[in-house]
Curated annotation (Swiss-Prot):
Transmembrane regions listed in the UniProt entry: none
Organism: Streptococcus uberis (strain ATCC BAA-854 / 0140J)
Name the record gives this protein: Formate--tetrahydrofolate ligase
Keyword field: ATP-binding, Ligase, Nucleotide-binding, One-carbon metabolism
Pathway note: One-carbon metabolism; tetrahydrofolate interconversion
Residues engaged in binding ATP: 65-72
């Protein structure tokens, strides 16, 4: 079998102008970035707002193994399969961060014969969105430091600046730094740090904004620091929201590319799901819904993280809610949740599949709490055995959830036809009755408790002394009714990455909160979740090169 990049490089791409005609996008509606990439114009985005809204399919997964379970691959393959069976379909995905691409994951544009192309461009610099977000974020940092240097009219307490710089790389050495050293002309010395770009609040804002006006308002509402009276200092106090919006003027426009099978794809925005809300942009998803009859989108990591945030944070900003949720499962992940060591996951173990099924069952039941029909997609791997597949299908039938085997990685659109037909049948026969997990009027504390109890299966929530003090502050500042974005390990329902399966009887500890008032939510930090990852011992970058002709080598 060829590698992902070899498959991608063997495909003869069609001009993006030809691809987008399938969904009624004309040459004048796009801004070209070469022959195979484009951005959608504001004029077209506004024009289609009066169009009927199509069906929305959310793809999520069980708690993953470190290698991931193929959500992006399944999303792409499902969209291709829907087109193959005659359904006018678009896909709306996140764009990858360069940090994980160079670090542990390699490329992140699908895999095998279910990829979005040109994958090298998408994985590297694409249309420059990540750089624009990085620049806007760091421009704000520079403007804060300049404000301190020029007299500090707002009385910002330099010990309580919460805005960090960012970089779209994994670089643990930058987690904690001191800026302003050297002499008085170099600024006011203070502690600072770097997050990865996809953890920036500006990334979350870009992905939730509905237009430039909304983007500017959200940027103005960012809290960057506290003054000497411990009152919040906003971007609007610095009067720089206009400049930040200008930097992001083009980045907010969704990017258009294609799959191997020519399905039009909107790839835009990429917040992580363990430290942010983990969904592609509202603009991309909303626009796809008005251009196609079916839109397939995904939410990062397992359904306890990305899907919960999609349903509780993103959906209120969309013109519709999901008509179906597809939960991706792999036999290797189920065996891991059933107690099998990572080194033995390729060996047949039917009993481990039975034991690990508890993880899948909880995710299915969690999605049903939102009133949305669920379909299970088994992402097929070479090491899967007939006995393991049979027992998984039997277990799914026992909880009355439709299940289909999909081999889109190996067989492309054809490998997803059965799944596509089942998803369409479920959408046509079962009407979704979406409801959020919590109400707007619930306090931050109540929202956290509902997520922990109803989604994670935990017993109780423990709040640190710092978190308790912050809750009092939030009530004072009027932030106590904002949605909650949980920052938690992706490997477990709990805050302990080693507690696999479907654990119960555990508590979740909230060590602190981070207000993201521009994005419109409060981040609750659990465990040791890092906002700036480090590189592994053998980074994926060690396998990468470029030929003398300029061809990418080893990019997954």
């Amino acid at each position: 079998m060829k590698s992902d990049i070899e498959i991608a490089q063997s495909i003869a791409l069609k001009p993006i102008t030809e691809i987008v005609e399938k969904v009624g996008i004309a040459f004048d509606d796009i801004e070209l970035y070469g022959k195979y990439k484009a951005k959608l114009s504001f004029d077209k985005i506004n024009e289609v707002k009066s169009n009927p809204v199509g069906k929305l399919i959310l793809v999520t997964a069980i708690n993953p193994t470190p290698a991931g379970e193929g959500k992006s691959t399944m999303s792409i393959g499902l969209a291709d399969a829907l087109n193959k069976i005659g359904k006018k379909t678009m896909i709306a995905l996140r764009e990858p961060s360069l940090g994980p691409v160079m670090g542990i994951k390699g490329g992140a544009a699908g895999g095998g014969y279910a990829q979005v192309l040109p994958m090298e461009d998408i994985n590297l610099h694409f249309t420059g969105d990540m750089h624009a977000i990085t620049t806007a974020n760091n421009a704000l940092s520079a403007l804060i430091d300049n404000h301190l240097q020029q007299g500090n009219e707002l009385g910002i307490d330099q010990r309580r600046i919460i805005w960090k710089r960012v970089l779209d790389l994994n670089d643990r050495a930058l987690r904690h730094v001191i800026v302003g050293l050297g002499s008085p002309v170099n600024g006011v010395p203070r502690e600072d740090g770097f997050d990865i770009t996809v953890a920036s609040e500006i990334m979350a804002i870009l992905c939730l904004a509905t237009d430039l006006k909304d983007l500017k308002e959200r940027l103005a509402n960012i809290v960057v620091a506290y003054d000497y009276n411990r009152k919040p200092v906003y971007v609007r106090d610095l009067k720089v929201e206009g400049a930040l919006t200008l930097i992001l003027r083009d980045a907010i426009k969704p990017n258009l590319v294609q799959t191997i099978y020519g399905t039009p794809a909107l790839v835009h925005g990429g917040p992580f799901a363990n430290i942010a809300h983990g969904c592609n942009s509202v603009l991309a998803t909303s626009t796809a819904l008005r251009l196609a009859d079916y839109t397939v989108t995904e939410a990062g990591f397992g359904a306890d993280l990305g899907a919960e945030k999609f349903l509780d944070i993103k959906v209120p900003n969309l013109p519709t809610s999901p008509d179906a949720v597809v939960v991706v499962a792999t036999l290797r992940a189920l065996k891991m949740h059933g107690g099998v060591a990572k080194t033995d996951l390729n060996q047949e173990n039917v009993e481990a599949v039975r034991a690990g099924f508890a993880n899948l069952e909880r995710h299915v039941n969690n999605m049903r709490q939102y009133g949305v029909p669920v379909v299970v997609a088994i992402n097929e791997f070479v090491a899967d055995t007939e006995a393991e597949i049979a027992v998984l299908k039997e277990l799914c039938q026992s909880i009355d959830v439709p299940v289909e085997l999909a081999s889109v990685w190996a067989n492309g659109a054809e490998g997803g036809v059965a799944l596509a037909e089942t998803v369409v049948k479920v959408i046509e026969q079962e009407k979704a009755n979406y409801q959020r997990l919590y109400n707007d009027q619930d306090s931050v504390e109540e929202k956290v408790r509902k997520i922990v109890k109803n989604i994670y299966g935990g017993d109780a929530v423990q709040f640190s002394a710092k978190a308790k003090n912050q809750l009092k502050q939030f009530a004072e500042f009027g932030w106590d009714k904002l949605p909650v974005c949980m920052a938690k390990t992706q490997y477990s329902f709990s805050d302990n990455p080693n507690l696999l399966g479907a654990p119960s009887g555990f508590d979740i500890t909230i060590r602190e909160f981070v207000p993201k008032t521009g994005a419109g939510f409060i981040v609750a930090l659990t465990g040791d979740v890092m906002t700036m990852p480090g590189l592994p011992k053998h980074p994926a970058a060690l396998n990468m090169d470029v030929s003398e002709e300029g061809t990418a080598i080893g990019l997954f």
